[in-house]
Regions:
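Catalytic donor nucleotide-activated moiety binding site of glycosyltransferases and closely related
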Residues: 47-51, 57-58, 182, 203-235
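Catalytic binding pocket for nucleotide-activated donors in carbohydrate/polymer assembly enzymes
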Residues: 261-319
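Active-site and donor-binding regions of nucleotide-sugar-utilizing enzymes
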Residues: 6-15, 21-22, 36-45, 50-141
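Donor nucleotide-activated moiety binding/catalytic core segment of transferases
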Residues: 71-75, 220-255
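Structural loop-to-beta junction motif characteristic of Rossmann-like glycosyltransferase folds
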Residues: 49, 105-106, 247, 263-267, ...
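A nucleotide-sugar donor-handling region in carbohydrate enzymes
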Residues: 131-196
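A donor-sugar binding/catalytic signature common to diverse glycosyltransferases
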Residues: 88-91, 96, 241-280
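C-terminal amphipathic helix plus adjacent low-complexity
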Residues: 309-352
């Protein structure tokens, strides 16, 4: 079987990297194409996944439109040469959709972002199936297939990931230390337009430093006062560090969910709220969401301090994680069954 992938965000690399390895090991032929954004290509290099760049994401709306149009044209040429049996893409604009229609080849999407309404409006008509977590809040119609998992469980499920203790040790941290990780996003995605998160970053850090060491992971440049806090490890080691983190605080939904599936409590400060984070908050108590633009930041700050006062926070996180893992599946295993069985065995692919 020949499978063509496209990614346009670093998180999509993590989503598909184990799937690609599994398919390659089973004798299938895969090809990765990339719309460059942030550290996407660096991650692919670090995981040894060959790729072909078909464009570079730009922050402006007009820049995105130009990039996407050019990428579709380039992908059409790539697909004609590669001759895929199936094409696979993550959340965002389904740029493989038009290619699939023109070549009469099926396109499937793995999506977890309900608020990307423009992307769904323009992309969904061209795709054949849209696979979403069971907690996804929107009904996308007959093309939608739900499964009991999160994207983050494709690469952080215990059958796929074992944290490396050498990463925190390289920063002078041991198991007893309190580490607080702040995550700031770039706000360049279309679904981020008009949204907001943490504004008083320096004030947060001054107060949080009373509890432990503070490090920052950021998609954007930091000011001179914040740059010394930037995380001094490569992006592919973020999850190793996140496993040993006491509290994760940030604007990014992906890192909030990554924290949850690793048993690290997370504060999510963003006016966007997806079904994944809502479930991780209401069912598992691992994420605290603060979407109110007027009061969210202040309420999140109080919640963060309250959690850090709890000496048993890490142990409680581990217990909550055990429940989460008992109710969710290994998403990479699920995706392998979907791809190999497409389209005949899609309905039963979620069986453990």
């Amino acid at each position: 079987m020949r499978v063509l992938f496209t990614v346009s965000h670093p998180a999509h690399v993590h989503l598909f990297r184990n799937l690609i390895r599994e398919l390659d090991a089973r004798g299938h032929i895969t090809k990765m194409t990339v719309l460059e954004k942030e550290v996407t290509c660096r991650l692919l290099d670090s995981f040894g996944i060959p790729y072909q760049v078909v464009g570079r994401m730009r922050p402006s709306f007009s820049g995105k439109a130009y990039t996407l149009a050019l990428a579709v044209a380039r992908l059409l040429r790539v697909a004609r040469d590669f001759r895929p049996d199936l094409m696979v893409e993550g959340p965002g604009f389904a740029i493989l959709g038009p290619v699939g229609k023109l070549l009469k080849k099926p396109v499937i999407i793995f999506d977890d972002t309900e608020d990307a309404r423009l992307e769904h409006l323009l992309g969904d008509p061209f795709v054949d199936r849209i696979f979403t977590p069971s907690c996804y809040r929107r009904d996308l119609g007959p093309k939608q297939v739900r499964y009991p998992g999160y994207h983050e469980l494709a690469y952080l499920h215990p059958s796929r990931f074992t944290p490396d203790p050498r990463v925190p040790e390289s920063l002078g941290l041991d198991a007893k230390d309190t580490l607080i990780l702040l995550r700031f996003v770039s706000w360049h995605a279309l679904h981020d337009r008009g949204e907001s998160g943490i504004r008083r970053k320096a004030d947060w850090i001054r107060e949080l430093e009373r509890y432990g060491r503070v490090l920052i992971s950021s998609e954007s440049p930091l000011g001179k006062d914040l740059e010394p806090y930037r995380l001094p490890v490569p992006p592919e080691q973020l999850h190793d560090l996140l496993s040993f983190t006491t509290l994760s605080i940030g604007e990014g939904a992906t890192v909030a969910s990554e924290s949850a599936v690793l048993g690290t409590h997370a504060i999510y400060v963003n006016t966007l709220r997806a079904g994944v984070q809502q479930e991780e908050e209401e069912r598992y108590g691992l994420v605290s969401c603060f979407p109110d633009p007027a009061t969210g930041e202040k309420e999140a700050f109080r919640k963060a301090l309250s959690l850090l006062e709890n000496p048993n926070l890490r142990e409680e996180g581990r217990r909550k994680r055990e429940r989460l893992l008992a109710e969710k599946i290994d998403v990479t295993g699920y995706m392998v069954r979907v791809v190999e069985g497409y389209p005949d065995r899609v309905a039963g692919a979620a069986a453990r």
